[in-house]
Amino acid sequence: MTRRNMIGSMAGAAVVTAGKPFESLIGNSEPQTQLKGNIHHSVSQWCYGDIPLGEFAKACKEMGIESIELLNEKDWLTVSNAGLKCAVGYATDWGIPKGFNRKENHEKLIADFEAMIPKAAAAGVPNLICFSGNREGMNDNEGMINCAIGLRKLMPTAEKHGVTIIMELLNSYGHKDYQCDKTSWGAALGEMVGSERFRLLYDIYHMQIMEGNVIENIRKYIKHIGHIHTGGVPGRHELDETQELYYPAIMQAIVKTGYKGYVGQEFVPAQKDKLASLKKCIQICDV
C-alpha cells in the first residue's frame, strides 16, 4: 500500500487481516521499552496497513512509541484507547495532487479543515496535514501566493483551537510535479502565512532526494518545521546500513535545535518482520 492509496481510500472500511492474528507475533507480556526521552517517536500507520490497528497500537506502545499518525478521524479513538497520540491526522479526502495552490480548490479544502480542526483539538490531535498540490504549469510564486490566501483563512480557527496545519515537503520526482518540493519554498510560504499554526512537515527522505544537506537545512529552517518524517535513501526502506543517511547524526542535530515535535517513522519495511524493523529504527533514532 502507498500513501496515495491510503489517502484515496479514506472513506473505506478498516482493513481486516485474514489468517493468523498479528497478536501472536506481538506477544502479550512484553515490558514497555524505555527510551531516552529526547525524541518524541511516532510512526505512520500506512506502512503497516496489513496489521490491525489495535494490535499495531499495542506493539507500538511496547516499543515506547508515543504516536501513530496519518490516521482518519474514525481511528483516533483506537490509538487513544491504547495510550497513544495521533500526531498527525487527515482533514480531507483529497489526495496529494489537489492542494491549496489552486484557488478553485479552496472552498472544499477550507470547509473540510474548518470542520476537522475542532474535532482534532477535542481528540488531542495536534497537527492536520495539507499539501500544496501539483504545479500543472503554474509558476512557484503564483502557487505560493494562492496557498497563502487559502491557508490564512484557516489560521483564526487553527489558532483558536491550538491545532497546527502542516504542509508536507515531497520530492517532485516520485510525486511528479508536486509544488512544495524545496524547504526554502515552504519556509517562504510560512513567512507569508505568518502564523505559528502553520508549519512544514520536513520529510528527510524526500528532501535528501531533492536538495540534500539535511542537517544544515533542518538547522536553518527549524522555526518553520512542525513535524519530521524519516525514510532510508534510496528506496524508502529501513534506516540502517542499507541506505546512505546516518540517522543518529541527523537526530542529534534535531535535538540540539530544541525541537519538541514528533519524529515519525515513514519507511516501508523491506524485512519480513516489520515490527522488528520498526523497533530497530526507533532505537537508531533514539539519541
What name fits each language-model region?
Residues R4-K61, V125-P126, C180-Y202, H206-V287:
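Histidine-acidic metal/acid-base catalytic patches
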Residues M10-F22, L35, G99-R199, I209:
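Active-site acidic/histidine proton-transfer and metal-coordination neighborhood
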Residues C47-G49, N72-K74, T92-W94, N134-E136, ...:
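Active-site-proximal loop/turn and secondary-structure-junction residues that shape catalytic pockets
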Residues F56-D75:
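Catalytic domains of carbohydrate-active enzymes, especially glycoside hydrolases
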Residues W76-S80:
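Active-site-adjacent beta->alpha loops and helix N-cap segments on the catalytic face
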